[in-house]
A protein has these predicted regions:
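Surface-exposed amphipathic alpha-helical segments
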Residues: 35-38, 182-217
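Bacterial signal peptide processing site
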Residues: 13-15
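Sec-dependent signal peptide recognition
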Residues: 1-3
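Proline-anchored loop/turn motifs at beta-strand termini and strand-loop-strand connectors
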Residues: 24-45, 207
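C-terminal motif of bacterial Sec signal peptides marking the signal peptidase cleavage site
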Residues: 8-11
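A short, solvent-exposed beta-edge/loop patch
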Residues: 176-182
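Conserved polar/disulfide-associated segments of primarily extracytoplasmic proteins
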Residues: 42-172, 184
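Soluble non-cytosolic domains of exported or imported proteins
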Residues: 26, 114, 118, 193, ...
Length: 217
């Protein structure tokens, strides 16, 4: 089960942050207490593309943990792709042997959305061949840097815009491969570009709290 602990301020004041760990207690972060936690299982399933009752979906449920937080007045999973208020999605994947052999920094960049040129081209090509209008257009890179943690874990943090319908959505994506090469932990923070421009410092604090912890034993 998801372990969520609330840090209380001195006295009887309201909580300032919600502190979150994944079910194995190895990935943790904090979000302002004003964010509402929502069930991310349906979102994770949609991102995977697996049919709900398939064997692949059942196996994925054993390997993948996910949660989401939304600051909107009416929190909803679909705010990941159209949010006037900040939305945070976090997931931890235990990699299969095949995935361990192919993981790379570019794979970390593309873990949720198409970011690298090769993956964006493949995404648009698939949409063209199926006759579907692509949901994501007008990609704009903002920043891209490596993340190196003290325990040997490494990853990337990329920020970019996508045009989704009539709005421009900004995404701040952090993906970290643990020091054993066994798990990938991902945090995606998003809201409309005007919201992101006004609240960038707050999002930096959330992303900066995203850490890995090596457990003893």
């Amino acid at each position: 089960m998801l372990l969520v602990t609330i840090l209380m301020l001195s006295g009887c004041g309201p909580p300032e942050f919600t502190y979150v760990r994944d079910r194995d207690g190895t990935t943790y972060f904090k979000v302002p207490a004003s964010f509402a936690q929502i069930d991310a299982s349906s979102l994770d399933l949609a991102l995977s593309g697996n049919p709900p009752d398939s064997q692949a979906a059942l196996q994925r449920a054993r390997r993948v943990w996910a949660t989401a937080f939304d600051q909107a007045e009416q929190p909803a999973i679909d705010h990941l792709f159209d949010s006037r208020a900040p939305f945070v999605y976090a997931t931890v994947h235990k990699l299969t042997e095949e995935q361990r052999a192919t993981v790379s920094l570019d794979r970390l960049r593309d873990f949720i959305l198409p970011v690298t040129e090769e993956t964006r081209t493949a995404y648009l090509t698939r949409a063209l061949h199926t006759g579907r209008t692509p949901l994501f257009t007008g990609f704009e890179p903002i920043s891209d840097r490596l993340v190196l943690l003290d325990n040997g874990a490494r990853g990337v943090r990329v920020r970019f815009n996508y045009q989704i319908g009539a709005t421009t959505q900004t995404f701040d994506h952090t993906a970290i491969l643990d020091d054993q090469g066994a798990t990938v932990s991902v945090m995606l923070i998003t809201c409309r570009s005007s919201c992101f421009a006004a609240r960038g410092a707050e999002f930096d604090e959330i992303a900066g709290s995203f850490k890995l912890l090596r457990l003893r034993g």
